[in-house]
């Protein structure tokens, strides 16, 4: 019989041997631990494939075993699969390992420096894995233990280690929304850097400044975030780890987006995507990180269709790496939910957006406390979707139920945002604006007006008179005055202001202009100004023609398959533009 007609393919000798060891796991358990790390991991992966999670969990919960498995660097994706399966199964392997490491650090406090140095190295690898896997609280516990060991020796090597600890701590605290601890972590890192400087030593500051930028961005301190991104870019040098370079480019791009420096943002994020795929591969979590930020850029420059495609690609990667109930998967679901909501806003088809929003909330509520800040944005997205579904619903009872659910979600999001950021913050203002829109749908017009005005005042003071966020809130207040309160003169002024900001930032084909143009057509019809009605019908027709031509060909992923510039050229181009323009804030 020809080989191609075989209905099965024989196992390799190696795989047969691994299967034999697993079949005799109980008897050979101790011997397995003496195998080289790659072979030892393959035995454990076979346990995972056979669904023997209790046995796998008992192995991975032992710090010595897991530390050895972590040395099999080329198996990291497969390790994420095993680890997530254990977490989903209810084996709290992340917290067990973090506790074991912390306890070991307390035991060796009196040991010599070499023992502590070895423990710190183990901690960096363990904490790094937990951080990459999204188990931020456990990673934080590990890094705090490492930092404690560093403080026991007042010498140069441990100052370098302490700086690295602080950078990693800042990263996991940012990821876990512990922003109140972020600035003190940064200051501690600076203290150690100053010590090093006094002794003629320098630690590269790119990663630290990049994490500070992420912290300030999350708190909506956009001017400060931009300033520190510039400082981080200055620190990019030859020999810096690619991961650090990619992360700094990502953060700088996001800071440029919110400052509406779109050309700079495009150059930075496209190079970050290219660099991540070229270095890590197209199935790596770091590549998915860059895709999420690329999607953020595309959404903000109004290339909504491509942004949805990029967010979907990022989610696919994260699901293939992590699967299960993982925070990285949840954030990708949320980003895709919001972009799908924006994309389908005109059509009213929100099934896909709602699915992803509910998946995000389901995952977050399963693995994090019910008052965790990450829930604020997911609940906000679901509330926006429910409101639109309610508006299109013909059953009054169902409409009221959906609006009430959206109201509860918005209020919960607002309370979480105020607790984390205070009243005077862009995130809080967004929630006020969302409540304003909802109250309009609920026909509570005075409450709606109050919320919109509050949102506009906060955004104007924080972002200036001509920001995109201000235009959104101004347009929403115009809609309220036009459709429900008959305040046509006020509505007209607000519509024209919103249109002017939109055109200035995004050009004549900006998608948000449609709602302002339609609002003005309705307004001029209401007051009998038919000349203006005709004028804006023509404007809307021209806008539609522009939209048909816009983004009709470009494939966003194809667009980043190569980079015309080296990393050094990208960095220098950014810094030279900065020098020409002068400081932003």
Curated annotation (Swiss-Prot):
Disulphides: none
Keyword Protein transport part of the UniProt annotation: yes
Cellular component, GO, one term: microtubule
Activity modulation: E3 ubiquitin-protein ligase activity of the CRL2(APPBP2) complex is inhibited by APP.
SUPFAM superfamilies (alphabetical): TPR-like (SSF48452)
TPR repeats: 50-83, 120-153, 206-239, 288-321, 333-367, 429-462, 471-505, 514-547
GO function terms (MF aspect): ubiquitin-like ligase-substrate adaptor activity
Subcellular location as annotated: Nucleus; Cytoplasm, Cytoskeleton; Membrane
Mode of membrane association: Peripheral membrane protein
Function: Substrate-recognition component of a Cul2-RING (CRL2) E3 ubiquitin-protein ligase complex of the DesCEND (destruction via C-end degrons) pathway, which recognizes a C-degron located at the extreme C terminus of target proteins, leading to their ubiquitination and degradation. The C-degron recognized by the DesCEND pathway is usually a motif of less than ten residues and can be present in full-length proteins, truncated proteins or proteolytically cleaved forms.
Protein name, UniProt field: Amyloid protein-binding protein 2
Annotated source species: Mus musculus
The gene coding this protein: Appbp2
